[in-house]
UniProtKB/Swiss-Prot annotation:
It comes from Homo sapiens (Human). GO terms for cellular component: mitochondrial inner membrane; mitochondrion; myofibril. Residues 79-266 are mitochondrial intermembrane. This is Protein SCO2 homolog, mitochondrial. Homodimer. Interacts with COA6. Found in a complex with TMEM177, COX20, COA6, MT-CO2/COX2, COX18 and SCO1. Interacts with TMEM177 in a COX20-dependent manner. Interacts with COX20 in a MT-CO2/COX2- and COX18-dependent manner. Interacts with COX16. Changing A259V: In MYP6; likely benign. Disulfide bonds join C133-C137. Pfam families: SCO1-SenC (PF02630).
Amino acid sequence: MLLLTRSPTAWHRLSQLKPRVLPGTLGGQALHLRSWLLSRQGPAETGGQGQPQGPGLRTRLLITGLFGAGLGGAWLALRAEKERLQQQKRTEALRQAAVGQGDFHLLDHRGRARCKADFRGQWVLMYFGFTHCPDICPDELEKLVQVVRQLEAEPGLPPVQPVFITVDPERDDVEAMARYVQDFHPRLLGLTGSTKQVAQASHSYRVYYNAGPKDEDQDYIVDHSIAIYLLNPDGLFTDYYGRSRSAEQISDSVRRHMAAFRSVLS
């Protein structure tokens, strides 16, 4: 930080200094403006005893404020670039993990055959669970549709298709899925299928699930991994969000992925 002084000799030396300018940075622009303002001062102000006072308080405050704004802007730009590079590395690492490779063949809650290619051209948020889940699945689906609603409310953003795939095909047939998804979002799509079809889709996304022992009422709990998956319009797995991530955090992440998306198929 440069210190202003009342000494005429020191002030003369200070006025002769040429600030270093970093081309292309906001900090450099602030230093340019500082130098220009100093050159516009003309004769130094004098105090009661004829001693040079340097620039007035208002000018010094203006210079300090502009210099601080330049540094703040440069810091924000560096932070945004760092976040972009981190997201790029994360996306590449997830793709190398080969999550979501291959196709799946299931039935939606209206009885129509569905495969992964049906969602090409759309952003998709996908969750694996089961309709008899007492608490976690409803909470995660509510969070998922909250993200969808937040993004729907922003003009200019493409729509996001919410998808719920069962890991309990024994109980979650087409009718059960239809009753269940209607309580969350009008566009939430429920998918089910045979035991083999569900296992194939779950395995593709590295979803673990295991049905527990049945009680006297033939009821049981399915233990399964908990994550919301994001697929881009190319149908590629792009990111996932664990239970600890809030709807706001997921929405922010989806926005960033949308802004950075470039199709590899076109």
